[in-house]
From Swiss-Prot:
Family: Belongs to the PsbO family.
Taxonomic source organism: Thermosynechococcus vestitus (strain NIES-2133 / IAM M-273 / BP-1)
Cofactor note text: PSII binds multiple chlorophylls, carotenoids and specific lipids.
A Pfam family matched in the record: MSP
Gene designation: psbO
Signal peptide coordinates: 1-26
Identification of the protein by name: Photosystem II extrinsic protein O
Superkingdom in the source lineage: Bacteria
Cellular component terms (Gene Ontology): photosystem II oxygen evolving complex; plasma membrane-derived thylakoid membrane
PANTHER family reported for this sequence: OXYGEN-EVOLVING ENHANCER PROTEIN 1-2, CHLOROPLASTIC (PTHR34058)
Membrane-related topology note: Peripheral membrane protein
MF term (GO), any: oxygen evolving activity
Length: 272
């Protein structure tokens, strides 16, 4: 009897140690579809303990990759023009009206060690865009494509290890919210549909021309990833991010809004 009690105690201790040392993303892997469906858990990024204040060493002679990068937005701000001309435009909070499908996940890419000791992350693949709609206080709804496509982000020089003082900053591409085959309510499109929904538009009518002539625009966005937690043993990092990009312009029909997105992120650094 004593032997069985001893074995049970040892087994419990071993399982406890294993669970503590397991990567953060492993906890999500144990959940079934029934555990996740309808709960919003699929939209949440893995997290690290507050005690994760270590460092992940970087060897300039080796190559690395960033895997499982997850970006979970928590706040969407839209720049609003003031009613008083003496005031400056400022970002105002909005209400998210999209369902629980706003996070970017499984993003991966090469992590280069540059000659000046800085690190550069080049995004290659993953779920790197999500169509999102937010609503302003006045009721106006702003669609946007939350994305980090083709992200190239670098750190400060002379980085020998990734710590809580490491920041990645860079630019990414923001594709059009609509694709070429999209038709607006009047049947106008880029690759198909009517060329014009107005009989004889007046010459030099720019507003009518913008609505008739559809364009697939590609703009730039900026992002800053601030590392706040590091697990030096597993290579996991977590922190906060802030990105700025443009909203949808209805394929050139109107001017886009400036959008600021804030949230949390998680990623794993691995030798290539």
């Amino acid at each position: 009897m004593k032997y069985r009690i001893l074995m049970a105690t040892l087994l419990a201790v071993c399982l406890g140690i294993f669970s503590l040392s397991a990567p953060a993303f492993a906890a999500k892997q144990t959940l079934t579809y029934d555990d996740i469906v309808g709960t919003g858990l699929a939209n949440k990024c893995p997290t690290l303990d507050d005690t994760a204040r270590g460092a992940y060493p970087i060897d300039s002679s080796q190559t690395y990759r960033i895997a499982r990068l997850c970006l979970q937005p928590t706040t969407f701000l839209v720049k609003e023009e003031p009613k008083n001309k003496r005031q400056e435009a400022e970002f105002v909070p909005t209400k998210l009206v999209t369902r629980e499908t706003t996070s970017l996940d499984q993003i991966q890419g090469e992590l280069k060690v540059n000659s000046d000791g800085s690190l550069t992350f080049v995004e290659e693949d993953g779920i790197d865009f999500q169509p999102v709609t937010v609503q302003m206080a006045g009721g106006e709804r702003i669609p946007l494509l939350f994305t980090v496509k083709n992200l190239v982000a670098s750190t400060q020089p002379n980085v020998t290890s990734i710590t809580t003082s490491t920041d990645f900053k860079g630019e990414f591409n923001v594709p059009s919210y609509r694709t070429a085959n999209f038709l607006d309510p009047k049947g106008r499109g880029l690759a198909s549909g009517y060329d014009s929904a107005i009989a004889l538009p007046q010459a030099k009518e720019e507003e009518l021309a913008r609505a008739n002539v559809k364009r697939f625009s590609l703009t730039k966005g900026q992002i800053s990833l601030n590392v706040a937690k590091v697990d030096g043993r597993t290579g996991e990092i977590a922190g906060t991010f802030e990105s700025e990009q443009l909203s949808d312009d209805d394929m050139g029909a109107h001017e886009p809004h400036e959008v600021k997105i804030q949230g949390v992120f998680y990623a794993s650094i691995e030798p290539a």
